[in-house]
């Protein structure tokens, strides 16, 4: 099958190359799926997409897949099954995928998901040096039916625009009147040259001049009103576009955040700004520039048809310029947005990890990495700006050539007395009101292309379904027993992190889960709050499957407290009340901070509970953060608390006090701990090793078994 250029798909984020390669093959057979959907099907993780993940995703879409390790002899075959996916190590460092579209004696033709490369050819020697030999060959099954997933285009923003129709109408009216005044000014110039000066009409000249001055004052008032209304429109569009993106981000499942770098998510805000810019410009061009072009075109035609026809000859030149630059701008916009996302990720990562960087004296090393990425971003941005400048230069040359030609030809008409000097000057003055709107319409090309690329990137987020998409009614529970039956879990299509877990936890039980690092303890409890879905098995709360719960209700009933809790910018009181029972009383707040052994620390601060904290409370110790977070959890309405190493930064004495405070509470508490002093005090201990529950019982019982727990305890 011959690969068509229209089937090319570029990756949007760093880890999308496998899904983008699969998308190209699917398009060749008539199926169109977003990268967001393919990521879900292929189990893409923060490390990328495995060949097994691509195979599984293709099989779900009714394709048969052969994954083979082949060699260069594949390209000697007369009927090689092009296109197919090849796994490579790019630049001898990065795992990557190409779509192989063909080959000849010396070259291999590839479609690289990297938007900076796209479709190209490599020498066989260069390709073979990168190729791991792993190839995926896809063919349709008898049950295959092409499917097309709809992605929203820029047209989807029309409802947002129509909601602002009053503001837009006022902007258009103001702009229209301003243009009319400018046109009247041009005719004033013609009358002055052709009538008032030759006939010495001083009185008429004075009256007309004062009248024109008044209209110019009105014009400036309208210009101010237009600028004000444009700001209003811009802010309202920002609320609709940017806030809707933030709202959607908050509704996405944890699996979305665990498979993407922070910068990839935050860089979409600048993408949204590109869309806003394009929307505002398009509104003005559609409603205003087109109207002005038609109106001034009629006036110019009435003024002198010969000169106007000369003007019309320049329009095809503008169109040719647009067509030539379209593919170039698309490629360069992709490059700029992608390198910007990588740069943002690195900066956020390094600021968050600044303490570690300083502790390792690695400032220079990390700076050099950002320096390289920033230079790469600047290079791409400069290339785009250079292309825009070249296009601007060509358009300016066309416009200036047109102006000179009009004056030249117009002067010959004046000399031959076919038009007056005033008519020529007026025509030339009016010409800018015809060409400037056309230039504005042409300039939409770069903005709309940038917006189209930005919209594609936003779509990859919007197409990830909200975890709250399915409306569920709140359930009433007669008890709060937890039960896990035959639970297994794996990230993507990697190895199983949990395997066949059987576990029952009674209401108000105090249970500790222990095990080596990486044994699956944290993953196990994250399933209880539906951060991730089990690969197989069932979890019930109060005898009801967790999948039947509204997630908001579930997380109000089960509160998960991680080892590194986040403290938000604001006062200590604001942080304590986040997620708390509505109208939590002062007595309840004091009880929570006492149970968490943080009351004395807070009250010793100068402003007490009103003490302002910066992002992640860098002024507090790790132990203080953990205790504030614990008090916050105790103020929540949760019946079940999961403390994932939530006291690991505390000294042994404080930790023991907190445990003694928690054990009598009328709540189920699940501790995850490496310190076995925590386990000693709980009702029951669960020992997890390599994703399996291997022992269960009290501290005394497990020591008597001389098993894995006994080894942990003594070692």
Swiss-Prot record:
Residue ranges constituting the ABC transmembrane type-1 domain according to the UniProt record: 168-450
InterPro entries xrefs: AAA+_ATPase (IPR003593), ABC1_TM_dom (IPR011527), ABC1_TM_sf (IPR036640), ABC_transporter-like_ATP-bd (IPR003439), ABC_transporter-like_CS (IPR017871), P-loop_NTPase (IPR027417), Pept_C39_ABC_bacteriocin (IPR005897), Peptidase_C39 (IPR005074)
EC number: 3.4.22.-, 7.-.-.-
A single cellular component GO annotation: plasma membrane
A GO term for molecular function: cysteine-type peptidase activity
Family the entry assigns: Belongs to the ABC transporter superfamily. Bacteriocin (lactococcin) exporter (TC 3.A.1.112.3) family.
UniProt-recorded name of the protein: Lactococcin-A transport/processing ATP-binding protein LcnC
Gene that specifies this protein: lcnC
């Amino acid at each position: 099958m011959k690969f068509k250029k229209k089937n090319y798909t570029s990756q949007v984020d760093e880890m999308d190359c496998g899904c983008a390669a699969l998308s190209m093959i699917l398009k060749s057979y008539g199926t169109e799926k977003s990268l967001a959907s393919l990521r879900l099907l292929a189990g893409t993780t923060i490390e990328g997409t495995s060949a097994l993940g691509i195979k599984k995703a293709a099989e779900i879409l009714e394709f048969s897949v052969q994954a083979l390790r082949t060699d260069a002899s594949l390209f000697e075959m007369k009927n090689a099954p092009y296109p197919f996916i090849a796994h490579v190590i790019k630049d001898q460092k990065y795992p990557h995928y190409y779509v192989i579209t063909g080959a000849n004696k010396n070259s291999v033709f590839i479609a690289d998901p990297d938007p900076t490369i796209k479709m190209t050819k490599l020498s066989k020697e260069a390709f073979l040096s990168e190729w791991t030999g792993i190839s995926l060959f896809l063919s349709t099954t008898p049950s295959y039916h092409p499917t097309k997933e709809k992605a929203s285009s820029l047209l989807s923003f029309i409802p947002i625009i129509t909601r602002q129709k009053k503001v837009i109408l006022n902007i258009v009216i103001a702009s229209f009147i301003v243009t009319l005044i400018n046109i009247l000014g041009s005719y004033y110039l013609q009358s002055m040259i052709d009538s008032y000066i030759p006939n010495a009409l001083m009185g008429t000249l004075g009256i007309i001049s004062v009248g024109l001055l008044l209209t110019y004052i009105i014009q400036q008032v309208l210009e101010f009103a237009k600028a004000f209304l444009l700001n209003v429109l811009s802010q309202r569009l920002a609320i609709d576009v940017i806030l809707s993106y933030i709202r959607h981000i908050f509704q996405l499942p944890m699996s979305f955040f665990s498979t993407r770098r922070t910068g990839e998510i935050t860089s979409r805000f600048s993408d949204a700004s590109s869309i806003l810019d394009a929307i505002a410009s398009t509104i003005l061009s559609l409603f205003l520039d087109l109207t002005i072009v038609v109106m001034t075109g009629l006036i110019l035609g009435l003024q002198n048809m010969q000169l106007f026809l000369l003007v019309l000859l320049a329009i095809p030149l503008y169109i040719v310029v647009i067509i030539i630059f379209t593919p170039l701008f698309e490629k360069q916009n992709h490059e700029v947005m992608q390198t910007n996302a990588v740069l943002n990720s690195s900066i956020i990562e390094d600021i968050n990890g600044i303490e570690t960087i300083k502790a390792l004296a690695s400032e220079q090393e990390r700076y050099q990495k950002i320096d390289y990425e920033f230079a790469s971003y600047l290079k791409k941005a400069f290339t785009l700006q250079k292309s825009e400048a070249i296009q601007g230069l060509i358009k300016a040359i066309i416009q200036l050539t047109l102006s000179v030609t009009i004056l030249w030809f117009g002067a010959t008409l004046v000399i031959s007395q076919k038009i007056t000097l005033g008519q020529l000057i007026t025509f030339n003055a009016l010409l800018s009101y015809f060409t400037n709107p056309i230039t504005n319409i042409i300039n939409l090309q770069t903005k709309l292309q940038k917006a189209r690329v930005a919209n594609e990137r936003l779509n990859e987020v919007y197409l990830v379904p909200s975890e709250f998409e399915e409306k569920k009614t709140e359930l009433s529970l007669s008890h709060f027993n937890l039960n896990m039956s035959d639970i297994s879990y794996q990230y993507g299509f990697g190895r199983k992190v949990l395997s066949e877990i059987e576990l029952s936890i009674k209401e108000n039980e105090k249970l500790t889960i222990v095990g080596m690092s990486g044994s699956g303890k944290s993953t196990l409890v994250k399933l209880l709050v539906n951060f991730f879905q089990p690969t197989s098995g069932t979890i019930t709360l109060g005898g009801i499957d967790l999948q039947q719960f509204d997630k908001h209700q579930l997380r109000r009933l089960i509160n998960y407290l991680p080892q590194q809790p986040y403290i938000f910018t604001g006062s200590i009181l604001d942080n304590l009340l986040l997620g708390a029972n509505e109208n939590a009383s002062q007595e309840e707040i004091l009880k929570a901070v006492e149970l968490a052994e943080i009351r004395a620390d807070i009250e010793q601060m100068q402003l007490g509970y009103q003490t302002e904290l910066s992002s992640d409370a860098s002024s507090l110790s790790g132990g203080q953060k953990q205790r504030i977070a614990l008090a916050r959890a105790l103020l929540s309405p949760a019946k079940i608390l999961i403390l994932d190493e939530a006291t690991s930064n505390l000294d042994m004495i404080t930790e023991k006090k907190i445990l003694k405070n928690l054990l009598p509470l009328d709540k189920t508490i699940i501790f995850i701990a490496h310190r076995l002093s925590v386990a000693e005090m709980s009702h029951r201990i669960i020992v997890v090793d390599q994703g399996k529950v291997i022992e269960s019982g009290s501290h005394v019982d497990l020591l008597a078994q001389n098993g894995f727990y006994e080894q942990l305890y003594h070692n």
